[in-house]
Regions:
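Active-site mouth of glycoside hydrolases
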Residues: 1-196, 201-209
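Aromatic-rich peripheral "rim/lid" segments of glycoside hydrolase catalytic domains that contact
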Residues: 264, 268-361
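Extracytoplasmic
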Residues: 343-529, 555, 583, 595-599, ...
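Short coil/turn motif common to extracellular beta-sandwich-like domains
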Residues: 539-545, 686, 813-823
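Extracellular calcium-associated, cysteine-rich motifs in secreted modular proteins
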Residues: 767-803
Length: 826
């Protein structure tokens, strides 16, 4: 397929690639290249690698034209000329797989005529009849499968026959698809009654309309999955078919994503006892396959020419470039992405991290691109870790697109000073990366970071075994993103001998490029004063954690409470408790009486002599130590919540809204869909909630719930019916009143009780139960009658009892005089 060779949009289907190459270097040289490509693309060494990683089967994508001629090239119409090359490829693969006890599953990836509108996949040529438009093509496919079955009927390492890959064609009811499948099955069973037959649905294998019930007693239904978010219920659409039809399932194709996505999806498949295969073992210039084929300059020149951005290469230049590309297919010439097999096998069963190659040494240089192998949140944390195609477009999980397939963004550079030619970039606040290291001698160290940045103000710090060992480092511009310089101001780091986990943490959203950190021992640990290093918020959202450069004496903590002060947004807050951080020697936790918010500016101060290190040193006084606030964002209630801005969502679609203010809205609602939002309420009270909704056809219903810490128990606070508005973008506002919500932090769940509506936003307001314009929280007269004039406390300004007043009129003495009057008494 063209995208695998970087020619997508230029030459996608194989026949287009071949024609373009013939135009450049002639038919003979093109055929020589294709033969070399087939020879080098998958060899015994590839099979050995798959076996070593843990695979027990190989799905072989086949093009029919390596085994038989196209119908238009047959010397006698309706007959079949057999070509040995394709069968020899299968024979070789079976021979290589047998010592490893690996099965080979034969996949008809390109059927006669092509089986889908997506020509890149099946080599469909729209100027000719497709498989579905030609009985001759269908006959050839049936005959080919019978020929294959005759040849391999007795081979025990054939894992089965995947009859047609990823049909994507308009086939009403699946009728013709089933007819062709049944014809192939009948032909195979005439000669081979043993091997499994794999059946893929229409619409890229996932539409099984018309394909049930099964027509053979040794059949498997095969589905595919790409790009969409991996959720626990992703297989709920297909698992019932397995049970209802009593037919096994096989996930025959997936991939093209990040390591995180791979681990999650494979874990889900294994949990549900569904076998799987992966696409693909190697591609040109990509990071998401185990082997990356190097893109040579000559081939790049060909691509540039096809794009209209370069000169046409000569015939010899083109031939040399393509033969070099074919040579680069060999494993020994590829870039091996060891992180991918690790994600697909080891990481699906453990959260443990392991060194990328071997433990890096201190003293010495730590190359930051060689971080530990493991999952997101265990070996690293990155804000973007997979491509979920939520907006229908590709979204890169790795902005550098080099070296590894995680969310950690890696680029290449030409720096020759303390560098392996790679650096971390595109950093964001809260991200971190871990390294298994071995410290050879206890002592005081300095660190030198190799950094490039166009901007000033990027920040990072280091920790060892999750205890900070440096203050937050602020970076000044080096003059450019590729202008690397030493940042040498990292001193007085105390490290203990032994094996540890070193982490680099990025503390704000100003990006930096950083390639390495070199550690140099400067003296004994006793030469460094006992001092505070950093402070961070804690996930309980009421505490801060202070880090020190030495271990803290636990016996000195209790008496030190009065020596600390915590200031939030300029106001000192009451400290509740101070304690040693669990399982940590260099950290204490200060818990406050009140909650903290993600937007708070927090500083810590210390003045006294109470807190001591285990070596007996008194803590140096400090003031205005800025606390790194990493709390998750919460919506402050009362306030507005944009419906699409949830922490977790299930089942909704997101679309552009035509409502006032623009933005997005949630849509495609069905009963059971839900979205979770993190909220903070600043007082304990009920609220009124406005919901901005639209609906084309009928009414719906929304429920709001407070969810407990386990995420399993819900407490209803209100429900509201959504009206029919006669348009999906015809908006109106409906209101409901909630039960009392306590003060503090909560998870709010918005659940669809009855679907068929769009939701733009919902807004919590303090209620005004009597409708007098004064919020209940300050309304001293909460039940005033409608229309009563009230003051700012919500109480009536005055009242006039109907039976306790008198009005009288005295006329003027003469027309034109002004001595008349009106009187009022109560």
């Amino acid at each position: 397929e063209g995208y695998m060779n970087q020619s997508a949009g230029l030459a996608g289907p194989q026949h287009e690639i071949k024609n373009k190459l013939i135009e450049l270097m002639g038919k003979d040289k093109t055929e020589t290249f294709f033969a070399e490509w087939r020879k080098n693309h998958f060899t015994k060494r590839d099979v050995d690698s798959l076996a070593a990683w843990g695979f027990n089967s190989i799905r072989l994508p086949m093009h029919y034209n390596l085994m038989t001629l196209p119908i238009e090239d047959e010397p006698i119409a309706g007959e079949n000329t057999w070509i040995e090359e394709g069968f020899t490829i299968i024979d070789n693969l079976l021979e290589w797989a047998r010592p490893h006890n690996m099965y080979v599953i034969l996949d008809m990836h390109a059927a006669p005529g092509g089986q889908g509108y997506n020509a890149d996949i099946s080599d469909y040529d729209s100027s000719k009849a497709s498989l579905w438009e030609s009985t001759a093509n269908q006959n050839k496919l049936v005959a080919l499968w019978k020929k294959i079955a005759e040849r391999y009927k007795d081979n025990e390492w054939i894992g089965g026959y995947d009859l047609i890959n990823e049909t994507n064609w308009d086939l009403p009811g699946g009728t013709l698809l089933r007819q062709v499948f049944e014809r192939i099955t009948t032909a195979i069973r005439e000669v081979d009654k043993n091997h499994i037959i794999y059946i893929e649905g229409n619409d890229y294998a996932n539409n099984f309309t018309g394909l049930t019930p099964p027509w053979d007693d040794n059949m498997v239904y095969s589905f595919h999955k790409y790009w969409s978010t991996v959720n626990d219920d992703d297989l709920d659409w297909i698992l019932p078919m397995r049970d209802q039809q009593n037919v096994p399932l096989w996930m025959g194709e997936s991939g093209e994503n990040s390591n995180t996505w791979y681990t999650r999806f494979i874990s889900l498949l294994e949990k549900n006892d569904v076998g799987w295969a992966w696409w693909t073992i190697k591609k040109v210039g990509d990071i998401d396959s185990p082997f990356s084929v190097k893109l040579n300059p000559g081939y790049q020149k060909i691509l540039d020419y096809w794009k209209g951005e370069g000169d046409k290469p000569t015939e010899e230049e083109a031939y040399a470039a393509m033969m070099k590309l074919a040579d680069n297919l060999l494993i020994e010439n590829c870039l091996y992405r060891k992180d991918i097999p690790d994600a697909m096998f080891r990481q699906t069963t453990t959260d443990d991290v392991i060194p990328y190659s071997e433990k890096q040494s201190i003293p010495g240089r730590i190359d930051l691109s060689d971080y530990d192998l493991g999952k997101n949140n265990f070996a690293y944390y990155d804000t973007t870790v997979s491509d979920n195609r939520e907006n229908g477009e590709f979204s890169a999980w790795n902005s550098g697109w080099r070296y590894r397939n995680d969310g950690v963004d890696i680029e290449e550079n030409n720096d020759l000073n303390n560098s392996n030619g790679k650096h971390i970039g595109f950093t964001n606040k809260g991200e971190w990366i871990s390294y298994s290291v071995k410290v050879f001698q206890t002592g005081a160290y300095k660190a030198v970071a190799r950094i490039a940045s166009q901007e000033t103000g990027g920040e990072f710090h280091l920790s060892l075994n999750d205890e900070d060992i440096t203050t937050t480092q602020s970076i000044t511009s080096t003059g450019g993103w590729t202008t690397f310089k030493n940042h040498s101001d990292i001193n007085n780091i105390i490290l203990d001998e032994g094996e540890h986990i070193l982490k680099i943490h990025f503390d704000n959203d100003i990006p930096i490029n950083i390639s390495s950190i070199k550690f140099v021992r400067t003296g004994a640990a006793s030469s460094v004063d006992f001092a505070a290093i950093n402070g961070n918020t804690v996930s309980d959202e009421k505490s801060i954690e202070l880090s020190f450069n030495q271990s803290v004496s636990s016996s000195s903590i209790e008496s030190s409470k009065d020596d600390f002060s915590i200031v939030v947004n300029g106001l000192e807050k009451e400290i509740n408790t101070i304690s040693l951080s669990p399982n940590k020697q260099r950290k204490i936790i200060i818990t406050l009486k009140e909650n903290l918010l993600y937007s708070d500016e927090i500083v810590a101060n210390y003045s006294g002599s109470s807190l001591k290190s285990n070596s007996g040193q008194e803590l140096k006084s400090f003031s205005d130590l800025l606390i790194n606030n990493t709390l998750q964002q919460r919506f402050v209630i009362p306030g507005k919540i944009e419906a699409e801005a949830s922490k977790v969502k299930f089942g909704f679609g997101i679309e552009d809204t035509e409502d006032e203010g623009g933005g997005k809205n949630l849509g495609y609602t069905d009963a059971g869909d839900y979205a979770d939002y993190l909220i903070y309420t600043n007082s304990s009270q009920p609220y009124s909630v406005d919901f901005r909704v639209a609906a084309q056809n009928g009414t719906g219903e929304i429920g709001l719930y407070i969810v407990d810490a386990t995420g399993t128990r819900e407490f209803e606070i209100c429900t509201v019916e959504t009206p029919k508005t006669d348009g999906w973008q015809t908006w109106t506002t409906v209101t409901a009143n909630t039960k009392n919500i306590g003060k503090g932090i909560f998870t709010l769940r918005m659940k669809v009780l009855k679907g068929g509506f769009n939701l733009n936003w919902f807004e919590f307001k303090e209620p005004d139960s009597d409708g007098d314009g004064i919020k209940d929280s300050i309304d001293n007269c909460s039940d005033t009658p409608e229309g009563t004039a009230v003051d700012f406390t919500g109480c009536p300004i005055f009242t006039l009892p109907l039976d306790n007043n008198k009005v009288w009129v005295t006329s003027a003495s003469c027309i034109g005089n002004t001595d008349g009057s009106i009187g009022l008494s109560v």
